Amino acid sequence: MKRPDYRTLQALDAVIRERGFERAAQKLCITQSAVSQRIKQLENMFGQPLLVRTVPPRPTEQGQKLLALLRQVELLEEEWLGDEQTGSTPLLLSLAVNADSLATWLLPALAPVLADSPIRLNLQVEDETRTQERLRRGEVVGAVSIQHQALPSCLVDKLGALDYLFVASKPFAERYFPNGVTRSSLLKAPAVAFDHLDDMHQAFLQQNFDLPPGSVPCHIVNSSEAFVQLARQGTTCCMIPHLQIEKELESGELINLTPGLLQRRMLYWHRFAPESRMMRKVTDALLEYGHKVLRQD
């Protein structure tokens, strides 16, 4: 069995994290040539490329597996050193999370862990359909995802579901939907998506109104909080988690345009196995809080 030298593997990690050889060399305080040599040593050891030399570079499938291994080793090592050394640097936890979870339940869930444990969070925001890929690539040690199946050498637990409602302000509804929400009226009503790969709005309209993807005008805004603001100010209609707009719905500032219809996204918590003690704390906190505030049926 080939056992990688972790100092050499850190060179591969640095190239991916810093998006190039030059910045990786600066990060590691070595020459660019030395970075290339270390990666070449790894590739010779495993007999295959570990890095696709694009701009920015990206790991091959084998490179992803090695980076995932490095994440696990670093987490266990840092936790052990934390037990042995006083005043050590807080443990870094890189997690991939979707923007809507971050805007609603995730931070309250992590509050007890952050208050009691010496950790530093690196929250990488990604669509819930793609967060698991960051775990697969070894960029993070945990991910909130809609994928229910665990990756090899990983664990998964169900968190619960976010229910999305199709909402807008009352003036917006009066302007664009005077006779109710119909297929023809939707074609004229501005909507919003998180990015070009966000299919939440399009999937809802296709499922319930038989509108093909791309048929509705859509703003692109990379912020869950901005969705709420855009809807409140009467700029767009959009899909927003019910958990995020309970007060606005109760006050009438926002209205549910399609009562009885919703889009449900079941969320799962993925992480490497075996779990360190710190990751077990994170897992327990997420599951306990998620089971309280997210739909479980």
From Swiss-Prot:
Transcription regulation listed as a keyword: yes
Keyword entries, A-Z: DNA-binding, Transcription, Transcription regulation
How it assembles, according to the record, is: Homodimer.
Question: Looking at the UniProt feature table, which residue ranges are given for the DNA-binding region?
Answer: 21-40
GO MF annotations in UniProt: DNA binding; DNA-binding transcription factor activity
Per the UniProt entry, what are the Gene Ontology biological process annotations, in alphabetical order? regulation of DNA-templated transcription
Record's protein name: HTH-type transcriptional regulator ArgP
NCBIfam families per record? argP, PRK03635.1, PRK13348.1
What is the gene called?
argP
Q: Which SUPFAM superfamilies does the record match to this protein?
A: Periplasmic binding protein-like II, Winged helix' DNA-binding domain
Q: What InterPro entries does the entry give? A: ArgP, ArgP_gammaproteobact, LTTR, LysR_subst-bd, Tscrpt_reg_HTH_LysR, WH-like_DNA-bd_sf, WH_DNA-bd_sf
Q: Residue ranges of the HTH lysR-type domain?
A: 4-60
Q: What family is this protein classified in?
A: Belongs to the LysR transcriptional regulatory family.
In Pfam terms, one family for this protein is HTH_1
Q: What does this protein do?
A: Controls the transcription of genes involved in arginine and lysine metabolism.
Listed PROSITE patterns: HTH_LYSR
Cystine residue pairs: none
**Does this UniProt record's set of keywords contain Magnesium?**
no
